Amino acid sequence: MTQKILNPVTGRFVKVDGSTGKKIKTGNIYDVNNILSSKLTKKIFDKIRRNDLAKEERETQQLTKKISKGIFDKIRSENKKYEKNTQKLTKKMVLDIFSKIYKEDSRKSKTQCVVSEKKDNGGVLLTEDLGKIFEKSICMLYDTPYIGPYKYGNEKPMLLKTRLTKLLDFFPELTHTAAGGALHDFTTKNSRYLSAKTSKKKDGKVAPQKIGQPTKKKFLEFFNLPPDTSNDDIKLFIKKNIVRILDEYFKYTFDDTIIYYNEVNNIIMLVKTLKKVKFDPNLIEFGCNKPGKSWKESTILFYNNKRLGEFQIHTSRSCIKFRWFFENILLLFPDNFEVTIL
């Protein structure tokens, strides 16, 4: 068998006896430079690959550092924001009456209770109905008869009763005395009084006793106004005599200690008046006096830019209503009240 050797120029095997076989195509003068041994090619490729990998690693490290810096900057920013917000919240809580509330630790109450939105007969539960249910729960706590008609069952009052046991520490005994629109909801043997107030909404609006929702006739009689006074004249009277009117509403609301239940906020608190609020007329503003506003049927009363109360004079109903934004008045005058969470 004829031996063959490798021609380094062409990269082809040729016979040892000198036979060239097929004619060799030399082509371009630079073709020889383009023919590299596999070993050299591998070296060059490995070098290129190492350089590329090193470059990629450097870029990756730079990118990682950049991303990490961005992440840590974001974390620091969020921490600063959190600290700032926390400081604001803390300051607000110190100023607010609810700093008192939180000191009482409302979480001590193990039983949470929210009264159903429906009556037993399937109708919508009104605020007045919730008030009767709440009074019934107090009657059950003190084992005293509920005075007046009651048609809402005992299941909901029993749930609320479990939240009220701490009330016994403040009023060892109570009797229900709310029949016929009486001034006091509950009375003790030594003539101490307790008023029960409820709200089904977050804003916590409550009306004063007796004069909070009177007929137009009774409103006019109470404030010694002519019986033929028009609604527009009543509105004008309210605006001109607002401090006097608020003083009367305050007396008929806060003369008694108040047991207050807000169903939406799921909170029950005992509120005792320490001193009468002195309303500054310069801080009072009627919402209807703001640009683009008017007093049609209702208007919001602001005090120091916070909602204090709401007046309602309906054209279709002969009544003059006023309701406090109850929790707001506690916030506005924290030194005037002692608040205890039950």
Swiss-Prot record:
Reaction it catalyzes: Endonucleolytic cleavage of DNA to give specific double-stranded fragments with terminal 5'-phosphates
One example GO MF annotation? type II site-specific deoxyribonuclease activity
Q: What is this protein called?
A: Type II restriction enzyme CviAII
Thermoactivity: Optimum temperature is 23 degrees Celsius.
Q: What is its EC number?
A: 3.1.21.4
The protein's induction, as recorded, is: Expressed in the late phase of the viral replicative cycle.
Going by the record, the broad EC class of this enzyme is hydrolase
| Activity vs pH | Optimum pH is 8.5-9.0.
Q: Which UniProt keywords apply?
A: Endonuclease, Hydrolase, Nuclease, Restriction system
Q: Source gene?
A: CVIAIIR
Please, one GO biological process term?
A: DNA restriction-modification system
